[in-house]
UniProtKB/Swiss-Prot annotation:
Keywords linked to the UniProt accession: ATP-binding, Ligase, Nucleotide-binding, Protein biosynthesis
Xref: SUPFAM superfamilies: Glu-tRNAGln amidotransferase C subunit
Keyword ATP-binding: yes
Native source species: Exiguobacterium sibiricum (strain DSM 17290 / CCUG 55495 / CIP 109462 / JCM 13490 / 255-15)
Protein purpose: Allows the formation of correctly charged Asn-tRNA(Asn) or Gln-tRNA(Gln) through the transamidation of misacylated Asp-tRNA(Asn) or Glu-tRNA(Gln) in organisms which lack either or both of asparaginyl-tRNA or glutaminyl-tRNA synthetases. The reaction takes place in the presence of glutamine and ATP through an activated phospho-Asp-tRNA(Asn) or phospho-Glu-tRNA(Gln).
Subunit and interaction comment: Heterotrimer of A, B and C subunits.
Spans traversing the lipid bilayer: none
UniProt catalytic activity: L-glutamyl-tRNA(Gln) + L-glutamine + ATP + H2O = L-glutaminyl-tRNA(Gln) + L-glutamate + ADP + phosphate + H(+); L-aspartyl-tRNA(Asn) + L-glutamine + ATP + H2O = L-asparaginyl-tRNA(Asn) + L-glutamate + ADP + phosphate + 2 H(+)
Signal peptide: none
BP GO annotations: glutaminyl-tRNAGln biosynthesis via transamidation; regulation of translational fidelity; translation
Protein name, UniProt field: Aspartyl/glutamyl-tRNA(Asn/Gln) amidotransferase subunit C
Enzyme Commission numbers on file: 6.3.5.-
Length: 96
């Protein structure tokens, strides 16, 4: 059975920017081990003769034809943007 430790849970929580308590880390460690155990049961299935799939339903993406259409004038975009710098919209940093 797959093992997951508290350090791994803390690492994933950090990546997801989640603040977790020591109690939550212990709880999530147990829960994630159970989830991984259920997923490992799939390895026991005999899939001989079954074609691999990426989607359960055979759905197709419907795309429209690209058409050139007028957009907002640059002056309007500048007026609507919260911050503008060197000809580009300035946004808050996403990554540290």
């Amino acid at each position: 059975m797959a093992k997951i430790n508290e350090e791994q849970v803390r690492h994933v929580a950090h990546l997801a920017r989640l603040a977790v308590t020591d109690e939550e880390v212990q709880q999530f460690t147990v829960q994630l081990e159970k989830i991984l155990g259920f997923a490992e049961q799939l390895n026991e299935l005999d899939t001989t003769g079954i074609e691999p799939t990426t989607h359960v339903l055979d759905l197709k993406n419907v795309l429209r034809k690209d058409e050139v259409r007028p957009s907002l004038p640059r002056t309007e975009v500048e007026r609507l943007a919260p911050d503008w710098e060197d000809g580009q919209v300035r946004v808050p940093a996403v990554f540290e």
